[in-house]
């Protein structure tokens, strides 16, 4: 079984020293869902929200969050991301919005936390923009779908 990399032998939290790692292309893909009432989703899709374009705002928030993950999550490295993509898809049958985030770089550490943060903050932004019309929206699941590159190898999770 793998060991926790952010904990020393004495049980102290520390930032991993990545200086000896090789630069490789690393990519991660994460998703999040926001389930809401059909009327709330229709309002978003019809462009009738008084705060403006919900999807555009959530996309920008997700991109910005990925770039600032190191400021939000202790022990994350600041990264020079080469790509952050946030896609929002309304699935009217399930009355949810699916958020897919992809982060990529060439570097020494992975971008899983950046992809997860992008998807999460995009979901939170949708909630924030729509809470005036519906407070019981549901966020989740939020999960890592895939990662590639790096010493630990590739990972692909099952689709929800």
From Swiss-Prot:
Active site: 128
Record Gene3D superfamilies: Molybdopterin cofactor biosynthesis C (MoaC) domain
Highest taxon in the source lineage: Bacteria
Pfam families membership: MoaC
Keyword list, A-Z: Lyase, Molybdenum cofactor biosynthesis
GO MF: cyclic pyranopterin monophosphate synthase activity
Keyword Lyase listed: yes
GO biological process: Mo-molybdopterin cofactor biosynthetic process
Subunit architecture: Homohexamer; trimer of dimers.
Record's function text: Catalyzes the conversion of (8S)-3',8-cyclo-7,8-dihydroguanosine 5'-triphosphate to cyclic pyranopterin monophosphate (cPMP).
Protein name, per record: Cyclic pyranopterin monophosphate synthase
Species of provenance: Sodalis glossinidius (strain morsitans)
GN (gene name): moaC
């Amino acid at each position: 079984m793998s060991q926790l990399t952010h904990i020393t032998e004495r049980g102290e939290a520390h930032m991993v020293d990545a200086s000896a790692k090789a630069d490789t292309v690393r990519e991660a893909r994460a998703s999040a869902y926001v389930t809401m009432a059909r009327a709330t989703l229709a309002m978003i899709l019809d462009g009738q929200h008084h705060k403006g374009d919900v999807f555009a705002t959530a996309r920008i928030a997700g991109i910005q969050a990925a770039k600032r993950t190191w400021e939000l999550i202790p022990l994350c490295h600041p990264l020079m991301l080469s790509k952050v993509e946030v896609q929002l898809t309304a699935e009217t049958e399930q009355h949810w919005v699916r958020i897919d985030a992809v982060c990529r770089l060439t570097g020494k550490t992975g971008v899983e936390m950046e992809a997860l943060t992008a998807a999460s903050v995009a979901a939170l932004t949708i909630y924030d923009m729509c809470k005036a019309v519906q407070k019981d929206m549901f966020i989740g699941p939020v999960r890592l779908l895939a990662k590639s590159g790096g010493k630990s190898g590739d990972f692909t999770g099952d689709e929800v």
